[in-house]
């Protein structure tokens, strides 16, 4: 059985004079432990598919057909509880980490918030886990960088922070 199965996923954007078909009949299967990368030209629908997987399509867009199955569970049928799956079971890393990070929160605050959303840990336990994750992705001297803001990291280091968020 697939860990993540996307079946005939289509995403449309209803514009003023036309419908834009951003993704049409996408089918993907990912087994447990596998990592999937979507590669393509600008505007080919990579981010749209990623956002559809975790139910983050903004108006005027909508998932017009298909399903996203996490095991046997269709995550689009349970939109109020999507946060249980987003980040805990499925993590996405987009090319530009700047858009994924909140510029007014420190890296540490963002990691703690994400960890505490998914795990019942105290703030201190979440901080310890955060520092371990930052070390794991190659952020040198993670404990001293914990209170830095995203703009204080290079692009590559911001990418590593986003990876640590996905690993939470």
Predicted segments, located by residue:
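ABC transporter nucleotide-binding domains
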Residues: 1-168
């Amino acid at each position: 059985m697939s860990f993540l199965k996307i079946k005939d996923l289509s995403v449309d954007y209803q514009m003023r004079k036309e419908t834009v078909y951003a993704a049409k009949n996408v089918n993907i299967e990912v087994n447990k432990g596998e990592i999937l990368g979507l590669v393509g030209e600008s505007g080919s629908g990579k981010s749209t598919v990623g956002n559809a997987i975790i139910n983050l399509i903004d108006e005027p867009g909508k998932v017009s057909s298909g399903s996203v199955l996490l095991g046997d569970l269709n995550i689009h049928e349970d939109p109020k509880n999507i946060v249980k799956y987003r980040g805990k079971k499925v993590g996405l890393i987009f090319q530009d980490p700047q858009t994924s990070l909140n510029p007014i929160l420190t890296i540490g605050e963002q990691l703690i918030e994400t960890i505490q959303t998914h795990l019942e840990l105290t703030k201190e336990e979440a901080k310890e886990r955060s520092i371990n994750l930052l070390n794991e992705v190659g952020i040198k001297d993670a404990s001293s960088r914990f209170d830095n803001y995203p703009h204080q990291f290079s692009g590559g280091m911001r990418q590593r922070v986003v990876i640590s968020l996905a690993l939470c």
